[in-house]
């Protein structure tokens, strides 16, 4: 059986070049362990890419420009890449319109929410470079556990949830940590599961979030 091809979308605001390579390698290994093949996006026509690939992974990275959700810039801590915003919105629409599965990670969950009409909190405290527990609904608990320990590397967060999405996990302070679509194969998580797959990487001791990548590959 042919391995599903998963397009991994990333940008230029993920940090140093070495960090970008490490992050891309982790996504690739997690997808390979899940039966898929990761293909790093390097631009191109979104509709053509969606026709060639079986699924989309919206990777972590910088912040989404507030103009995308109808707000002025309110935080000096934003790291914005408008070109990436535009490219990923085109990719999202191309894959989503074809009913192909999409997994959003960190920035990716925020992008999914914005692209479907939701909004973001531009800056929150206490969610950068730490680990904490989240409470998951049963549908997500089947993949991640009911109250898993997760990592946290973000300062933007989901605010108003798009009407076609619903919250699937929350941090103890009420921050939305996961979103699921009502009908489409679309899942977003605020944490970085690629860093929680022992022995590749283990930010949260004992956690293994490879099933999230299997979810993506199995729906192709």
Where on the chain are the PLM-derived regions?
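Conserved catalytic core of two-component histidine kinases
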Residues: 169
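N-terminal beta1-alpha1 cap of cysteine-dependent amidohydrolase-like domains
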Residues: 1-105, 115, 121, 125-149, ...
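Hydrophobic, aromatic-enriched interface-forming segments
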Residues: 109-111
